[in-house]
Amino acid sequence: MESLLLDKIDQPSDLKKLNAQQVEKLCAEIRHFLLENISKTGGHLASNLGTVELTVALHRVLETPKDKIVFDVGHQCYTHKLLTGRRKQFDHLRQLDGISGFPNPHESVHDAFIAGHGNTALSLAIGICLLYTSDAA
């Protein structure tokens, strides 16, 4: 499958230039990319296939890194990684010296936290909410 649209997405702002038909095509390209790459490197496939449209939609309306995205479980972030400039590094997903299978702020300013499993998501979201609604913000 030729990835014409995915090859042109290097940052979330690129998504805002797409029309609805292109977004639908992009989501299909992302699924194909994930299937192809995860079959080589291993990783969390189902959770990522289930969040493609959601992640694309979030990046079309939010402005990361200013806005923070908290994933239910960190290993749902593969589409997020593709949309934030790490597509070319996917050959080394979860490999030595490769990109992490979880959000990691050392990889990208678009990753707010290092988070893996579900119990951290609620705590992170509450913390962000408290920060932005407190007098300290």
Predicted features and spans:
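Glycine- and acidic
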Residues: 11-15, 35-43, 107-114
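Cofactor-binding active-site loop characterized by glycine-rich and histidine/acidic residues
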Residues: 2, 44-134
